[in-house]
């Protein structure tokens, strides 16, 4: 899937539509587990790199997660520009990374343990 190249101020409609985009140090992607179908997919919006997810939509549980950790001025602006304007569940950045990488199961299952 090709990412739309947009300006940061045009990010919100892409986020609300769950469309991948690339802006200036603000971008999104669909993440899914290898060898699984789209039921395990997550739509992740990042500021700068994968170490700072701002918002995550988890398809499996139909929930938006929001990074509740402290960040700088530019990342704060990225968050405002990409906010989906819907109910979100706030998480610490470490938990956001777990959800981005493993879905909500990353919050409840230790790494290496599968159901």
PLM regions with names:
Residues 1-115:
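Terminal leader/tail segments of proteins
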